Amino acid sequence: MYDAFAKVVSQADSRGAYISAAQIDALNAMVADGSKRLDAVNRITSNSSAIVANAARALFAEQPALIAPGGNAYTSRRMAACLRDMEIVLRYVTYAIYSGDASILEDRCLNGLRETYLALGTPGSSVAVGIGKMKDAAIAIANDPNGVTRGDCSALMSEIGSYFDKAAAAVA
């Protein structure tokens, strides 16, 4: 954000002109968008434990074989690993939301994840369902209009959904 402000000031200075109304409006829009991002990240982060726990609970209710003897989430150690992985995906999604860029999610979280799950015998389709459940919860929490920056958040919610979709597709 600082770079955008510095660029506008530098351009105006090189022309020997004041910053135009259009440039001020563009910077105001950028600040408002940044505030909405921060609100969304803060809400998702503040509710991350509930998002992960509720998504896992819903996943295991739909796919009880996962927690039955012989299932991929059977035993407390495997369950803990499943919850940890869901939390890691959610954390990297928040990084992508904050930056407005999926590359950190792709490079540091999703790159090679499908292959890891295949090697471990973890059903990627089940992981994708869990990610989808986190997506629904995170968007509902982030899109709550109470106590956040006002304005149309539909584009941001769509963007947030795309990060979860990217994660689900990477493991399916």
UniProtKB/Swiss-Prot annotation:
One of its GO terms (cellular component) is phycobilisome. This is C-phycocyanin-1 beta subunit. Gene3D superfamilies: Phycocyanins. GO terms for biological process: photosynthesis. It is found in: Cellular thylakoid membrane. (2R,3E)-phycocyanobilin 1 binds at C82. The gene is cpcB1. (2R,3E)-phycocyanobilin 2 binds at C153.
